[in-house]
Amino acid sequence: MSALLDRSTIFVREHVGMFKAANAYDLLDPATGAVVGLVQERVGGFFRKMMKFTQWKTRMSFHIEFHDLEGGRDEVVLTVSRPFTWFRSVVTVADGTGRVLGRFRQKLLSISPKMWVLDPAGNEVAFLKGDWKGWNFTFTDAAAHVLGTVTKKWAGIGKEFFTSADNYVIDISPACQGADLRRLLLAAPITADMVYKEYA
């Protein structure tokens, strides 16, 4: 069992770099500032890395791994991936064994970021909605009950953490029942960042 996946509040801090071919994020304990996980994009080959600096980066496939670093371990517990796309993104989330947990399907023709959250069978089980700035997101179930939030600011975090628009706090509500749904919520800010900010 991964302690990282059982957390209800996680701070996400992007690695900042002017010329970077792969995105990376630290996952921190909000109370202590300790790094408890790492999110790393895997970009293979010189050609693919060079394509990341062109207009084609908005269409390219991506594969991202969530590493649990708690207790001295380094275990891949989640993956987030998308194939090459022309228009609407469909992002697949799987656990460390490759079992599909669900998918995020981008909603087209929307001013603010919006994505349907699907179970492995393709049923709509939740909805991810962002504000027009793309900084704050609400994760709701099919009945519009809030299951969690992804926010740019949180009262429990020091201001020194917020040095980039791509730093977030994930807050999972007790109402978010089911391990798979909690893991999809954990993947939500990285998915939104890749689709709407890094790749939009």
Model-derived features with residue positions:
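Low-complexity or membrane-interfacial segments used for flexible interactions
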Residues: M1-V77, R82-V90, G96-L101, Q106-A200
